[in-house]
Amino acid sequence: EYSYCDYAIALVAKGLGKTDLYQQYLKQSSNWKNLWRADYEHAGVKGFILPRDKEGNWLDKIPFGNSHIQKPTFTYTPVTFEGPWYTPWWNMFFYEASSWEYALSIPHDVPGLIEQCGGKEKFDERLDIFFDKGFFNVNNEPSFLTPCLYHWVGRPDKSGDRIHEIILSLIHI
């Protein structure tokens, strides 16, 4: 979300003729790639937005709780429902969606996202898995545009099908 906001600021700066600010924020809008972990695999898909510590190391285990004795942790996964029962809906790294959802929420750089995912065919497969395995959550803003991403791989028919499925699931027909 920060990268998208940086992109929006860049566009405003460009419109105001502030070239230096435009360049600065346009560059910052690519920072989502710093959190893209290409080697991480989940549900047969590689590449996710994942947390790093302040030294830049990937965080595979997340500390949870305030115990000074046990220092409890749990292994991080890109979906919240795989965490322990005491894991909050949002944890300290993601606010309102899962890594699966945020990894598809790069609306200002969809071509870059498709490239990170391994090309159009892999991206199409990734979208299928995302929807078929139930990782899509219509209640989360980062997922709102995801059904339309099939357009970017030449499959607007699949976008239409997914949107139709979503509508039917919401009105329970």
Where are these regions (language model features)?
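Catalytic cores of carbohydrate-active enzymes
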Residues: 10, 14-151, 156, 160, ...
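Hydrophobic, small-residue-rich alpha-helical packing segments that form membrane-like cores
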Residues: 1-4
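Conserved small/polar residues in nucleotide/adenosyl-binding loops
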Residues: 171-173
